[in-house]
Amino acid sequence: KESYNLRVPEILTASSTRAALERRSFSELREALALSHARLARLWPALTPLERAACWRLLPAGCVAAAAKALSASARWEAYQASSIDCLAPYLEDAPLGARKYFRAPTRREAALLRAGIPK
């Protein structure tokens, strides 16, 4: 398998993201997303719904607002729906113990930000 170095923000692509998730390299992907959270909006269409949910939940707290503003309304709604850890079960089934710690749940403020501008 091809190896990717996600620590360089310019290399954060759909392929490198997918490879990191397949390897269960959650900390590596979290670090890359923290350095280039604005790229997530550009990557969003190329990722599967499960990959999108994982990337969204891996974003550090300080990056959520900027990343949410870069997403379309439909993408924000999809990110909002990823608020349950259960949606990540396929990645957590064979992940090392403690892998859940990398996936943070949205705060109430972040959830409200994701719902902003979305008709009820």
What are these regions (language model features)?
Residues K1-K120:
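Hydrophobic packing positions in regular secondary-structure scaffolds
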